[in-house]
Design a protein with these regions (language model features):
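Conserved GNAT-fold acetyl-CoA-binding loop/helix
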Residues: 31-52, 62-64
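Acyl-donor (CoA/ACP) binding surface of acyl/acetyltransferases
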Residues: 1-34, 67-191
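Short loop/turn motifs at secondary-structure junctions and domain boundaries
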Residues: 55-59
Length: 191
């Protein structure tokens, strides 16, 4: 499959049916899924894959598979999706990522997310991209901060797809506008 994006260490490609075994294995890992309501079984991962592919068909973008460029090993996914629920910040496009745990702590989520932001702002013409996670998910929050996203306490929200008082209900919202992203790129070039 032809890559959509290449980074220093990663190849980002559109999902296909052939990615289901790798996706299902990752989604069944309790460590990978610890900040989600549940692990996904094979059938649930197949449904997720169908939604990802349908989103791409409808919107022209979705989540991408991540593979190491040197070895073609499946790392996880990263990409953009329209937020599928109503909240104070919707309609919105969300950036997200999920990596197999053997790739945690290596900067790969940040590397992929930076490429996806560039695609979202420069190729797709998005004016703002959001990301959100549960308050306990510090690894994802660190990635959001590393890629320049910002959070306001007033933007915290209870995820509408989780029951009241669910331990993962409270979420932190991060945002990044195209203008701020461009400004950050300009500042990073200054000596």
């Amino acid at each position: 499959m032809n890559p959509v994006l290449l980074t220093r260490r990663l190849r980002l490609s559109d999902f296909s049916a052939s990615n289901l075994p790798d996706l299902a294995k990752m989604n069944a890992d309790p460590d990978v899924m610890r900040y989600f309501p549940q692990k996904l079984n094979f059938e649930e991962s197949a449904e997720l894959l169908k939604r990802i592919m349908a989103h791409h068909q409808q919107n022209g973008y979705a989540l991408f598979t991540l593979h190491l460029t040197e070895s073609d090993v499946f790392v996880g996914w990263c990409g953009l999706m329209v937020v599928p629920f109503e909240a104070h910040f919707t309609p919105a496009v969300e950036i997200g990522w999920r990596l197999n745990k053997i790739f945690w702590g290596k900067g790969l989520a940040t590397e992929a997310a930076e490429a996806v932001l560039r695609l979202g702002f420069l190729e797709l013409g998005l004016s703002e991209i959001v990301s959100f996670t549960v308050e306990l998910n510090q690894p994802s929050i660190r990635v959001m901060q590393k890629i320049g996203m910002q959070s306001e306490p007033k933007d915290a929200f209870d995820h509408p797809k989780l029951p009241t008082n669910h331990p993962l209900q409270r979420h932190i919202l991060y945002r990044l506008t195209k203008s701020l992203w461009l400004k950050q790129r300009e500042c990073s070039k200054t000596p």
